[in-house]
Amino acid sequence: MIGENKQLAEIVLVLDFGGQYNQLIARRVREAGVYSEMIPYNTPLEKILARRPRGIIFSGGPASVYSLGAPRIDRALYESGIPILGICYGMQLMAHDLGGRVEGASGREYGKTQLEITAADPLFAGLPESIQCWMSHGDYISAPPPGFQVTARSAYTPVAAMSDPARKLYGVQFHPEVKHTPMGQEILRRFLFQVCGCRGDWSVSSFIEDQVAAIRRQVGNGRVLCALSGGVDSSVAAALVHRAVGDRLTCVFVNHGLLRQGEAEQVQRAFGQAMGMNIVYVDASRRFLEKLTGVTDPEEKRKIIGHEFIRVFEEEARKLGRVDFLVQGTLYPDVIESGTETAAVIKSHHNVGGLPEDMELELIEPLRLLFKDEVRRVGEELGLPEEIVWRQPFPGPGLAIRILGEVTPEKLEILRQADAIVTEEIRRAGLYREIWQSFAVLPSMKSVGVMGDERTYAYPIVLRAVTSDDAMTADWARLPYDLLERISSRIVNEVRHINRVVYDITSKPPATIEWE
């Protein structure tokens, strides 16, 4: 796993107490040039200390410190001398553990809030006396623990920040990791560099060196099979493994029949000719579609596709002779969204939740703890083509989760044509790299329309386009009206069985980016 070989390098650990955005904390720390990992809150103290972290951050979470079964830590951690920053629930836990008082508020404080800095403190050094921050909490600290000073407050939160510099213990009730706290990154940097004394020398280049060495240790003299999709994730994973083991890597590209228009041919050209890797093309489209016949539940679709993927790779491995490892381009958001002990499952990812328990190949997931923007930087550093590095994310289950309900050949053809128009027009408008994802969704219901002099009863197409940095939060893209008009007009006129186009203007949260 990434980071296991970084015992002698500086690392800041984020203890996960269950908030869905907790991985953003690790991302912001890495943006400051400090390597960070998120680990379970109940990781044994000896394991935490063995990592020799320069600092520890307690994340937010949905629990109340007084709830039965609320997440707890070994209180000896406070006496370890390691600097600790508690965020939201993390600060409340610190206050509760060390003798402060936490109470339930009559109402939640949620959203943008003005923070008044009330005392000198390393976290706020050089910042204005009043700054905007993002709050999301029900409980609040009414009295800090002995030895702590209150360093900030808001209109509804008397202890919005507190610190005990002598023990290097700090807490903030707001969320510095989100962009709605404009000075949040500066606050985190002050904790990292002023309090923890970090150097900030982690980089993409150092990651590549560490990961190549880790892959070589894991693989030894074994042979490796890569699950290649042509997307940036599997492409960068393949390039990393190829750098580590060379021609002992065979890339298998499976056409599951759920790809976009022209995608199978494009991937074969790009990787077989341009990158010089061993590519095996497998057309398993009929097999996948037969398995999906009659299946309407999105979770079942994902698990069926994940299961069949692994089975196909196992069959190819047997054809190739001895193969020991399987590469997947699993990313950090995949792991987080598939659920941890303290975070509810949003949806299972085919790279994570759908793997058969009797899988015969050992997994290599070199990108498992990277965010998408970090993966792109790794890809550029490895010299991958721009059209691969900057390709928009595409889900492993493909169009199966953009067709609501049962997947049929007819629906696939409808969606392929509509999706191709969306991509073509977004590119033509020069917005492709600015938008995180832009695609079409085919719902299962139909609506009434009029085309010519005839009444129609046909499918709508849902247009989805979002902006994001990491897929953990996303906002709907404010596409120009004339662009929306062109997309709608072309789809209705060029794609049969479609009589309506609607635009999804829901952010994440409360929605997810994909519809299934």
UniProtKB/Swiss-Prot annotation:
Binding-site residues for ATP, renumbered to this chain: S229, G230, G231, V232, D233, S234, S235
Active-site residues, record numbering mapped to chain: C88 (nucleophile), H175, E177
Family annotation (SUPFAM superfamilies): Adenine nucleotide alpha hydrolases-like, Class I glutamine amidotransferase-like, GMP synthetase C-terminal dimerisation domain
Residue span, Glutamine amidotransferase type-1 domain: 11-201
Location of the GMPS ATP-PPase domain: 202-391
Pfam annotation, one family: GATase
Enzyme Commission number(s) of this protein: 6.3.5.2
Keywords for this protein: ATP-binding, Glutamine amidotransferase, GMP biosynthesis, Ligase, Nucleotide-binding, Purine biosynthesis
The protein's name: GMP synthase [glutamine-hydrolyzing]
